[in-house]
Amino acid sequence: MTDNKTVPNGAPILYIVPTPIGNLGDITQRALDVLASVDMIAVEDTRHTGKLLAHFNISTKTFALHDHNEQQKAQVLVDKLLSGLSIALVSDAGTPLISDPGYHLVTQCRQAGVKVVPLPGPCAVITALSASGLPSDSFSFEGFLPAKSKARKDKLLEIAKVSRTCIFYESPHRICESLQDMLDVLGGEREVVLARELTKTFETIQGMPLAELITWIAEDDNRKKGEMVLLVHGYRDAGEQQLPDEALRTLTILTKELPLKKAAALVAEIHQLKKNALYKWGLENLGE
């Protein structure tokens, strides 16, 4: 820890301030300090953010900056920054710019020599990934799936053969159609995780083969409600051997006492599996 000063004097600064995605307890003290200390807060929706600010007794004035006016209003905010005002940028929930407004403002700030200071904080993409059980060493956030089926399938075709985990946002009124398009493009065996209502009372994180997930959602209308994140397991070659959970548990236990290479050989013999596949899994998930 070096300096906990919130808004320094001198050079203009735009603060990127994440806000809770559901649970108000997730806001950081630093975020509250910045929001209370700046001269102005650029917000996606003045009414929505107004409730958040009122909850924490913050009276800083707000400035509406959303998808429909950002390109026109970004320069207005840059001019205010250059005149000496301090400004924080927030979205309705989560980290600004992540499928939310702010890109044009940040770009123009950097071009004008305004310092941009990001605060860490809530983000549905990372929150969902951390609990999904899908590989997290290589992933991409793809934003919202397109609203039209043709465009949606084209997007899914783009990621059909990539090995990384792909993450999407989706709205509840399109979730069934989107999963059906996924089924058509990716097949019923592809593992998909649905994370909905993250950090809220009815938080649900469910992962299973796509065909089973579609059935699971259809069984209860409540499972179609709320803010949603879809996480898609990366492509695996049909010839790539699938490792059973029991074998992976055995390998995990043995590597506590044996070198990975030897443990993989033993598990391969016990479970009639390929040693190289076990060794590769161990390197990726357990370390040498």
Curated annotation (Swiss-Prot):
- Which keywords does UniProt give here? Cytoplasm, Methyltransferase, rRNA processing, S-adenosyl-L-methionine, Transferase
InterPro entries, per database record: 4pyrrol_Mease, 4pyrrol_Methylase_sf, 4pyrrole_Mease_sub1, 4pyrrole_Mease_sub2, rRNA_ssu_MeTfrase_I, RsmI_HTH, SAM_MeTrfase_RsmI_CS
Name the SUPFAM superfamilies on file: Tetrapyrrole methylase
Q: What class of enzyme is it?
A: transferase
The catalysed reaction is: cytidine(1402) in 16S rRNA + S-adenosyl-L-methionine = 2'-O-methylcytidine(1402) in 16S rRNA + S-adenosyl-L-homocysteine + H(+)
Matching entries from Pfam families are given as:
RsmI_C, TP_methylase
Q: Which CDD domains match?
A: RsmI
Q: Name one GO cellular component term.
A: cytoplasm
Q: What is the recorded name of this protein? A: Ribosomal RNA small subunit methyltransferase I
Naturally occurring in which organism (per UniProt): Vibrio cholerae serotype O1 (strain ATCC 39315 / El Tor Inaba N16961)
* Taxonomic lineage: Bacteria, Pseudomonadati, Pseudomonadota, Gammaproteobacteria, Vibrionales
- Quick one: which gene encodes this? rsmI
